[in-house]
Amino acid sequence: MENKFNHFDNEGNAIMVDVGNKNATERIAIASGKIRVNRDTFLAIEQGTAKKGDVLGVARVAGIMAAKKTSELIPLCHPLMITNCTIDFELLPKTLEVEVTSKVKVTGNTGVEMEALTAVSTTLLTIYDMCKAIDKAMEIDNIHLRRKTGGKSGDFINE
């Protein structure tokens, strides 16, 4: 089977893929990424003492909002009726990192990979925004799709 980009027509014009004839199935996507911070920033996040408030709480809400708005940010992405979106954090004190994981679900005829990736990206950017007064050298890294299930192309695992 030949691999080809499906967001282009035969003349190379950008198109929105027609998903109208695809079966509605439950689809799940999980994405993750990390932000590396300095020790003071890590402690402020961990202890909830950042000047702007609850960094992880605000970042979680931002990530969920971003998942819901993905089709407004990515030009050829379909608007979806997301059935669930979760954002989880793992604090990694040895490496001074916060790992963010998003899980997005939909019952529909197209997947939610872009929503999961957008949720992680926005969550990480919100952490950066809320902490930049004390740490401008933070590094966002390793944003990737970890898993997707459902749909014609089958399951994908990258963990």
UniProtKB/Swiss-Prot annotation:
Annotated EC: 4.6.1.17
Pathway note: Cofactor biosynthesis; molybdopterin biosynthesis
Amino-acid biosynthesis in keyword set: no
Annotated source species: Clostridium botulinum (strain Alaska E43 / Type E3)
HAMAP family attached to this UniProt entry: MoaC_B
Taxonomic lineage of the native organism: Bacteria, Bacillati, Bacillota, Clostridia, Eubacteriales
Described purpose of this protein according to its UniProt entry: Catalyzes the conversion of (8S)-3',8-cyclo-7,8-dihydroguanosine 5'-triphosphate to cyclic pyranopterin monophosphate (cPMP).
Family annotation (Pfam families): MoaC
Assembly with partners or alone: Homohexamer; trimer of dimers.
Group of enzyme by EC: lyase
Reaction it catalyzes: (8S)-3',8-cyclo-7,8-dihydroguanosine 5'-triphosphate = cyclic pyranopterin phosphate + diphosphate
Annotated residues for binding of substrate: 76-78, 114-115
Record: active site: 129
Keyword match Ribonucleoprotein: no
The protein's name in its UniProt record: Cyclic pyranopterin monophosphate synthase
Family listed: Belongs to the MoaC family.
Any one Gene Ontology molecular-function term assigned to this protein's record: cyclic pyranopterin monophosphate synthase activity
Entry keyword set: Lyase, Molybdenum cofactor biosynthesis
